[in-house]
């Protein structure tokens, strides 16, 4: 069977899968989920169709940032075993195609958001894309050990965008959601970077773990403590305060336990401790935002 003017079907499907991988779909799912929590927590109502369009625009914006990140970092991705099978270093998509895809989705997502939702949400979406693709990827990532801290701002935008899709303006509540993701990001990524620090060093990426294992552990513990505290604050604004505080305290205690176990290890960080924290942090973010949505 032949599709698309003589292009074989298996090739067309392969290309579609490659472009999908270019958009970093796992990050996209998380972004849409946290943005949806912002919409649910926000006071007032939003037309279901407008809410759907907003979520799709946020997903497109996330994919656009992912594509631009892979375009710029293709040289690094080719060196690291964790990323060398990505579409560009494996030769399945060219750098030019990735750039075109990223730019097109960036413009389209912001334009549709401004046209159908509101200008504030569109501006925040544009800032999120620019912060990840330009400030983090092009400026910070190869220059400072604090790259993931400052770069985490980009990933913290979605719940604020979701909130403003409903209200038209950010608020303290939406900024608390922002801070949860901002404080969650460093422990999440640093836990994994402890296992991959040799590859980061080879690729020339100045991750904190490349400079000091102990400092990385200390930073992870510090951010985990701050996350524990800040994650309790949405309880001041949700309808089911007691239930939320019980959930947030329980999740935070497990997170801190993983961080403490990693901190107290002597010598080389073990895969068990690093992956234990990294894996639980994914569940933590999903569960804490689920709790916020359910208790609102």
UniProtKB/Swiss-Prot annotation:
It is an enzyme of class 2 (transferase). It is found in: Cell inner membrane. GO terms for cellular component: plasma membrane. It comes from the Bacteria. Pathway: Porphyrin-containing compound metabolism; heme O biosynthesis; heme O from protoheme: step 1/1. InterPro entries: Protohaem_IX_farnesylTrfase (IPR006369), UbiA_prenyltransferase (IPR000537), UbiA_prenylTrfase_CS (IPR030470), UbiA_sf (IPR044878). Keywords: Cell inner membrane, Cell membrane, Heme biosynthesis, Membrane, Transferase, Transmembrane, Transmembrane helix. Its EC number is 2.5.1.141. It is a multi-pass membrane protein. The chain crosses the membrane at residues 27-47, 48-68, 98-118, 120-140, 148-168, 175-195, 219-239, 242-262, 274-294. GO terms for biological process: heme O biosynthetic process. One of its GO terms (molecular function) is protoheme IX farnesyltransferase activity. Its main location: membrane. It catalyses: heme b + (2E,6E)-farnesyl diphosphate + H2O = Fe(II)-heme o + diphosphate. Carbon 2 of the heme B porphyrin ring is defined according to the Fischer nomenclature. Belongs to the UbiA prenyltransferase family. Protoheme IX farnesyltransferase subfamily. Converts heme B (protoheme IX) to heme O by substitution of the vinyl group on carbon 2 of heme B porphyrin ring with a hydroxyethyl farnesyl side group. This is Protoheme IX farnesyltransferase.
């Amino acid at each position: 069977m032949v599709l698309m003017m003589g292009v074989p079907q298996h090739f067309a499907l392969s290309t579609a899968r490659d472009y999908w991988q270019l958009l970093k779909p796992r990050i996209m799912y998380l972004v849409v989920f946290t943005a949806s929590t912002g919409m649910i927590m926000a006071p007032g109502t939003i037309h279901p169709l407008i809410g759907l369009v907003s979520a799709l625009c946020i997903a497109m914006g996330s994919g656009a940032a992912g594509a631009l990140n892979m375009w710029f970092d293709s040289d690094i991705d080719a060196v690291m075993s964790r990323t060398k099978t990505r579409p560009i270093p494996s030769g399945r998509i060219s750098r030019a195609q990735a750039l075109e895809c990223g730019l097109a989705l960036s413009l389209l997502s912001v334009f549709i958001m401004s046209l159908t939702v509101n200008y504030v949400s569109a501006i925040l979406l544009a800032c999120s894309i620019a912060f990840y693709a330009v400030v983090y990827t092009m400026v910070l990532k190869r220059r400072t050990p604090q790259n993931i801290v400052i770069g985490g701002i980009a990933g913290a935008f979605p719940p604020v965008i979701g909130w403003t899709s409903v209200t038209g303006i950010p608020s303290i509540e939406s900024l608390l959601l922002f801070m949860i993701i901002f404080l969650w990001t460093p422990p999440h990524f640093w836990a994994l970077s402890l296992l991959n620090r040799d590859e980061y060093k080879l690729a020339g990426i100045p991750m904190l773990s490349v400079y000091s294992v102990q400092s990385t552990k200390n930073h992870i513990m510090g951010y985990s403590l701050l996350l524990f505290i800040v994650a309790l604050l949405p309880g001041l604004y949700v309808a089911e305060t007691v239930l939320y505080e019980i959930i947030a305290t329980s999740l935070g205690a497990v997170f801190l336990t993983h961080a403490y176990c990693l901190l107290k290890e002597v010598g080389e960080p073990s895969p068990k401790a690093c992956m234990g924290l990294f894996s639980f942090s994914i569940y933590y973010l999903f569960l804490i935002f689920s709790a916020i949505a359910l208790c609102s």
